[in-house]
Every structure is written in C-alpha cells, then in structure tokens.
C-alpha cells in the first residue's frame, strides 16, 4: 500500500483518531482503513495527544549529511598513516585494517562507516583486495556451556616496532562465549606465568571443566623432545608439568591440539590482537611494556564488550552473562581442595627434597634446618615467586601439612629453579 501521507490528509487521520478516542471506532477498524499496523497507530495517537495543534503525517526523509572537509582530511591522514605501516617491511603488518581505522576515527569524533573508509582507501591507493581464503579449520563453537573448554596459549611477537625486545602474550578464552578471560604480556614464558593465568581464571570466574592447549613443554612432557635419555624410561605424559599439576589438583582436565589446523583454532585470536596492538603502538610511538599493556587492556575491553563476534554473532561478554543466567555454565565455584588452607599451596612451583641426617635440606647451595620432620625424610617445597618484592616464599610440606616456611631472594635461586 502507498505511504500514509500520500493517501490521506492530516485532518482526515485526525478525525479518525478523534473518533477512536470518543469510542466511535475501534483500533482495528482504523488500522484497516489507513493500512497501518498497531505500532504506527499508537505512535500517531500519541502525537495527536501530545501536539494536537501541530499534528502532521508528512514524511521527512532523514539523510545523513555529507562528510565535511575536516572529516575527509582526517580519514585521508589515517589511511596514509596505515599505508606507511603496510609498506614498512620490518613490521608484522601485511594489510589494511579498516575496522580498526574506523575505531580510531571514532575516538576523534569522526563517525563514519567502514564502507566509506574503504571507498576513500580505493581512491587514495590504500586498498588491497582480499586474498582467496584457503580451507580453514572449523570455527564453530564446539561447547554448549561456558567453562566447558578454555582455549589457552601464548604467543611471542614484537608487539611494538619501537620496543627493543619481544614479549609473550598469554591468553585464556572461553570457547562457548568467545570471551577473553585472561590476557597479559610477560617478558618470558614460564610455568609460573601460566600458573598465574590459571589462578586468575579460577578465582574470578570459577573452575573450568577442561583446558585446550598445544604441546608446548610448559603444558606437556613429550618423550623424544624433553628427555636426553635414549633408553626411554618415561613416556609421554608420564611426568606432569608444573602447570598441569595445578590443574590436576583442581580436577580440571587438559586436552591437546594434535594438528596444525586445530592449533590454529587457539592462535586465531592472536592475529587480530597482534594486528591492532602493533598498529596502535606504531602510530603512538609506544615502546615500554607497561604502555603496551595499556593498549592490550583497551583492546581486550573492546573485543569483550563492544564487538560482535563473527562466529557467535553476539558480543562475548553478553553471551557469557546470558549463559550464566540460563544455567549454561559448568564453571565450579572456587574452593580449596581438602587438606589445603591457602591458595599459595595450590598455585605454586613444586620441588622435592630429602632431608639429611640433621633434618636439613639444601636449596641453591644453602642448608636450612626444618623442624617437625624426621632425618632422611622426603619433603615437598612449594615456591611462590614475588617479582615485585624480588623474593620467593618457600613453604615446606610434610605429613600432608606445612611444617616450615621462609623467604629467599629470587636472584639466589633462579639459576637452579626454573619458574
């Protein structure tokens, strides 16, 4: 049916609505006469009640104004800045990211669509046609609840072209919601860094059912790679790594990516993070680890709370929260396992020692008297590094309880104990 303002005058519609108010005509009769729906009917009725003297049904097309010279100039400047990054062979940036550029423009008050940016890019010669995609590993969500599978990995990159060294990005991502639960940059990849990531996830979100990781030696002992002995005594997975010991205590399973395609499923989030973070650091001349961490936090917030995920077609944080409300979560509340009184004895580095005949144990060439144990007795050491204080808290366990504790500087034991 033709538009309302082309079929009736404002006075005619006004008469019909007045008849409805007086009880002479029903809503259905007026809707049928005007050819409108319920929503449109009540919108017209509200307009008549609020502004009877200026009631109108005229249609006013609202077209977005053309971009002004200032906006066009900023778009051009940002595109040319991106072109410098793409042309720089020393940077791990091989193409344009128009969505990221649109977000940068929005911060400066320029609201423009990505399509418009692409049009301007073509005009300036700042455009690359997308390459034909190869067959990729299935990106579908393989879980039906949050906490069922946590994708966890680390990636080494030069996150800023102005930095003097590469840093490791460690992330934990919930498979169902695609929400990044943990993300941090560290100077070196250690068991302790991954243990801290697991601690953050478990204490802030709950204990997940299982982790999905690759075959890095931090996560898994593999014979023929991690042993120098040719006469094999221990096979693959016969030794639990420090990280896996923590997960075993919390009754969380681990599954491994057994193919390059499956491994790519974990590493895919690093692609967009690397691209956006490197671009931001290059454009802002950022070089320090703390500054890059700020860029990372901003990017994770945008991804979790503002961006619609291409696979789920939902914003990750909203999907995560909705799953919780609909009881689609297998996260278990964080509680200490039986026999433990402190989380320090869960999230720690474990080593074994045997006391001598004088109840002393040796660490980094130093002897320490341990009370509450027998001569020649085996004890377990729980080491908790504190890099800010440059010390390690050492908690000595025997008979399923802590019997002694002391602190040592990290510099005294970091050569004999690998965190």
Place the predicted regions along the sequence by residue:
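C-terminal, beta-rich DNA-binding module of retroviral/retroelements integrases
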Residues: 300, 304-419
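Charged alpha-helix within mobile-element recombinases
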Residues: 236, 242-334
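Acidic/histidine-rich, metal-coordinating catalytic segments
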Residues: 203-235, 260, 316
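Mobile genetic element proteins and their domesticated derivatives, centered on retroelements
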Residues: 16, 41-44, 75, 101, ...
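Residues that mark the N-terminal boundary/hinge immediately upstream of a DNA-recognition element
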Residues: 25-26, 97
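Short, basic alpha-helical/linker "hinge" immediately adjacent to a nucleic-acid-recognition surface
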Residues: 2-7, 18, 27-81
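Basic, flexible linker segments flanking DNA-binding modules
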Residues: 52-158, 232-238, 320-323
């Amino acid at each position: 049916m033709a538009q309302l303002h082309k079929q009736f005058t404002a006075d005619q519609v006004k008469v019909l609505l007045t008849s409805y108010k007086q009880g002479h005509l029903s809503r259905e009769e007026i809707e049928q006469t005007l050819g409108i729906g319920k929503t449109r009917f009540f919108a017209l009725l509200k307009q008549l009640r609020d502004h009877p003297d200026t009631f109108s049904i005229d249609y006013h097309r609202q077209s977005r104004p053309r971009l002004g010279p200032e906006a066009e100039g900023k778009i051009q400047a940002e595109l040319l800045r991106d072109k410098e990054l793409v042309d720089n062979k020393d940077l791990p940036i091989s193409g344009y990211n128009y969505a990221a550029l649109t977000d940068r423009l929005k911060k400066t008050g320029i609201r423009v669509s990505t399509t418009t940016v692409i049009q301007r890019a073509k005009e300036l010669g700042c455009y690359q046609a997308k390459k034909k995609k190869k067959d990729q590993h299935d990106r579908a969500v393989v879980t039906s609840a949050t906490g069922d599978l946590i994708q966890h990995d680390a990636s080494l990159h030069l996150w800023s072209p102005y930095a003097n060294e590469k840093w490791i990005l460690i992330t934990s991502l919930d498979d169902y919601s695609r929400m990044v639960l943990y993300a941090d940059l560290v100077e070196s990849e250690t068991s302790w860094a991954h243990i801290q990531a697991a601690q953050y996830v478990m204490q802030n979100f709950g204990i997940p059912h299982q982790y999905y990781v690759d075959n890095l030696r931090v996560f898994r002992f593999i014979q023929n790679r991690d042993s120098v002995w040719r006469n094999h005594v221990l096979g693959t997975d016969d030794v639990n790594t420090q990280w896996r010991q923590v997960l075993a205590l919390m009754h969380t399973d681990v599954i491994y990516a057994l193919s390059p395609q499956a491994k790519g499923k974990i590493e895919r989030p690093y692609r967009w993070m690397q691209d956006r973070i490197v671009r931001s650091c290059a454009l802002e001349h950022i070089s320090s680890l703390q500054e890059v961490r700020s860029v990372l936090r901003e990017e994770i917030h945008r991804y979790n709370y503002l961006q619609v995920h291409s696979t789920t077609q939902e914003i990750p944080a909203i999907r995560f929260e909705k799953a919780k409300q609909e009881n689609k979560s297998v996260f278990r509340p964080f509680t200490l396992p039986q026999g433990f009184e402190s989380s320090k004895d869960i999230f720690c580095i474990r080593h074994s020692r045997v006391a001598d005949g004088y109840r002393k144990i040796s660490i980094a060439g130093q002897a320490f008297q341990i009370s509450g144990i027998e001569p020649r007795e085996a004890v377990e050491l729980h080491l908790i590094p504190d890099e800010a204080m440059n010390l390690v808290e050492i908690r000595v366990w025997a008979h399923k309880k802590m019997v002694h504790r002391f602190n040592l500087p990290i510099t005294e034991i970091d050569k004999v104990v690998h965190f």
